[in-house]
Amino acid sequence: MANLKYRILLIAALFAASVFALFPRTVVERVKREGVFVYDTVRRVPLKRGLDLQGGMHLTLEVDESKQTVADKSEALDRALKVVRQRIDEFGVAEPVVQKAGSERLIVELPGIDDAERAQDVVQKSAFLEFQITDKTQALEKVVPRFDEIAKTQGITVASGTAAAAGDSAKSTSVNSLLTQNADSAKDSTAAAGTTGADTTIKAPVVTGGLFSTNVQPGQMPGQYIVPESAFPAIERALQHPAILAAVPPGKVIRWGVDSLVSGAARFRALYVLDARPIITGEVLTDARPATDPVEGNVVQFTLNNEGARRFKTETGKHVRDNMAIVLDQRVVTAPTLNSAIGRNGQITLGGGTLQSAQDLALVLRAGALPVPLKVAEVRQIGASLGSDSISKGVMALGVALLLVLVIMVVYYRFSGVLAVIALVLYLVYTLAILAGFNAVVTLPGLAGFVLSIGMAVDNNVLIFERIREELDHGKSTRLAIDEGFRHALGAIIDTSAATILSGMVLYQYGTGPVRGFAVTLIAGLVAALFTTIFVTKTFFLVWLNRSRGTQTLSI
């Protein structure tokens, strides 16, 4: 009798804990309202819906070895995963999924995303920030003949150039605007630019004849050059050639500007020659925030840590009246003139960029740079209407399956079937609680796994009931028939459940996305099914026997 009470208490305690785990709770989420992210308090059921149930975007990312050779991909992806997860958390996506798939890929699932291109850019952007002084020694002019010679030898001409690379077709800016971008990037320590807004006349080529000497023209600040849009593909291709990279003057690097430039009907690109050693990098940033400057428009204000502020002030103090390029992912965003030393606080001007672009840049800077460049191996966009349709069909399938099971069990096994149905209800609650406890994401394949586990839970009861029937047919008492029925069916139940759980573990380990969702739900359902079949259903029989002492028959 005491043992029976403990059984009942355990079942009741687990049921109460499961209901508590599934009860809607108050959470604080970062949500977007009228284009601005704010923190809001909402109530949510702890079960997360996957992309196929609410729509969104699925990304598969892998290391881009064309940009950087990585010795240990798995370790690099572990570090990249932390950065991507932090970016997604700040992006304001509710219930995202960021996980590794094997040792070479990252899976990112963003439910409810309506701007897929923007989300992909935030996830994939390397966000490596550098502050570098522009060249004052005319180093490029000294090697232009050598560059021309190499380009001619390799057959690189304007006619042979290809279309501009993706990501280099940014917004257009007037040449006059770019060449007069000398306003300082720091609120607390710099003054206005030394140039004026007067019309700019592009100077004649440095030399004549070759690819570089014909198409590379000096700008109005040291280290800046202007390249016609028509020559950009060829120049970019040439600058990636190993021989030209080797001929770059020691201690210098060549970087393109972010914007495409306009002068009348002509379009140009800005090219910069910079000191290779950066003054500081984004590693010393402690904060970055979007803001609106009355002069510069939308900007990103940043704050440095103590070491970064000390180094920045010292280095910028050495380069007063020089130009300092702010370089993001090897593209020059702006190159203001330093009118005085800069301390802890500063800002990055975006040259007419939108508030949203300022928000995104601040977000990725706060999260930090990716340790390795990533490329998109696969992208899938799932509409919200498709997700809603999946929910209705999935719930319908689950409801029909449950109804048929309940009716068949009650009709075929009568009173024993009723006990099995009650145990099945507890099984459903336990399974959902397990999924909520492990923060599992419910997907359409997951619902299929749920239905399959229901079938296996019912099958376990069928095995037990048939064994009990056999024992009763052999003339054994009701109590003995129940005990023997459970004992003889136990081995088969454990064997089949264990084999299926192992299969689910293999699917989870080597599968991705939907396959993992199926595996998680299947495993959770089988664990709950084992408990309810072996322990809960047996307890119900014991309660019935205790209240019906002397009963010689069993409705089964």
UniProtKB/Swiss-Prot annotation:
Recorded superkingdom: Bacteria
First-listed, main subcellular location of the protein, grouped into a coarse class: membrane
Biological process, per Gene Ontology: intracellular protein transmembrane transport; protein targeting; protein transport by the Sec complex
One term of GO molecular function: protein-transporting ATPase activity
GO cellular component: plasma membrane
Subcellular location: Cell inner membrane
InterPro entries: SecD (IPR005791), SecD/SecF_arch_bac (IPR022813), SecD/SecF_bac (IPR022645), SecD/SecF_CS (IPR022646), SecD_1st (IPR048631), SecD_SecF_C (IPR048634), SecD_SecF_C_bact (IPR055344), SecDF_P1_head (IPR054384)
Transmembrane segments: 8-28, 391-411, 418-438, 445-465, 488-508, 517-537
Membrane topology (UniProt): Multi-pass membrane protein
The keyword NADP is assigned to this record: no
Keywords: Cell inner membrane, Cell membrane, Membrane, Protein transport, Translocation, Transmembrane, Transmembrane helix, Transport
Entry-linked SUPFAM superfamilies: Multidrug efflux transporter AcrB transmembrane domain
Described purpose of this protein according to its UniProt entry: Part of the Sec protein translocase complex. Interacts with the SecYEG preprotein conducting channel. SecDF uses the proton motive force (PMF) to complete protein translocation after the ATP-dependent function of SecA.
Protein family membership: Belongs to the SecD/SecF family. SecD subfamily.
The protein's assembly and partners: Forms a complex with SecF. Part of the essential Sec protein translocation apparatus which comprises SecA, SecYEG and auxiliary proteins SecDF. Other proteins may also be involved.
Protein's recorded name: Protein translocase subunit SecD
